Amino acid sequence: MTPMSAPETLSSLVDTRRVLVTAGAGGVGKTTTAAALGVAAAKRGKRVLCLTIDPAKRLAESLGIGEMRSEAATVDNARFEAVGIPMKGSLTAMMLDTKRTFDELVIKYSSTKEKADKLLSNKLYKYVSTSLAGTQEYMAMEKLVAVKDDPRYDLVILDTPP
């Protein structure tokens, strides 16, 4: 945006972007904004993935769904249509599982299944994959890279922690 140009509209953001990130201090409405962007985009016909890396798990509450897991779960469009929101697209939600994402990387880059299994069962690996400082942030970036090109989604919305 140049200093003299008008800001983008919500419609243009969800129509032209592949990834949107909500970021900021705690309590500013990141999760609510991520949920609203997801609903707005799905209403316009987009296939949306809302990925949260916030351990508070508020995205599930904002979307009116049960417990979030590391597997993508599509929100039933009937939920929205029941409250007068016609959905042309779909809204899927997923919560980052740091350990699982780390394990997926090991499997992806190991030359054999045996080598992957050996590393995955190693006590030091098990500790590092869950306790190393910065692991959650690194795995969040890895997961974002993995899903941003996923043909199942037109838009990925990343909900970040405070």
Question: What residue spans do the PLM features occupy?
Answer:
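Flexible phosphate-sensing "switch/lid" loops adjacent to ATP/NTP-binding sites
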Residues: 2-21, 28, 33-162
